[in-house]
Amino acid sequence: MALSTYTDIETAVIAWLNRVGASDIAANTHDFIELSQRRLQREVRVPPMETLVEGLTITAGSASIPTDMLDVKEVIAYDGSVAWDVYRTTYTKVKAARLSGLCGPTHFDTVAGNLLFGPEPSAGVSVDLVYYKEIEFISTLVPQNWFSQYAPETILYGALVEASVFMKDTEQEQKYEQKFKEAIQALKDQKQKAEHAGRLQIHTN
């Protein structure tokens, strides 16, 4: 059975559940698939989710967090001759770095919807951000995304977990939860191999 589109996965969820005697939950399949994808967004970080923003707009040591950002992967600063890592730390340490009067930035933290840098970027210093972005969910209006094309089993097993919870079927929930975790781990292993091989897919805004 093909599993590359929303309709494919929706059909598979219904078919798999029918095999265990659940023929009356088709109307809720959309919810199960959406909940599965929300869980994926929380638990998985894969190269196709990476986006590079070059030359962040920073005012008074602060930059707005991109609206689609899930998590920061890497921040670097550079001045035309050298580049260096900007490390994530606590707000206390960022504040202390700001008060130090040294050249920067060397550290950052996320606070109230902003990236705060310490010390504030020195004159002539630019900052690049690599972050993990949300991948648009598959739905009746969006038939495919990266997960449905390359890891559809993650969406399917996650949806079956949610459906099993809905049906109060603990045995099925445990079975599909194990399959979901195995599929997630396979993705993480694949990412690790790709990073060691130096083949990352980064999209530039």
Kindly give the residue locations of the regions a language model identified.
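Glycine-enriched, solvent-exposed interface loops adjoining structured elements
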Residues: 1-205
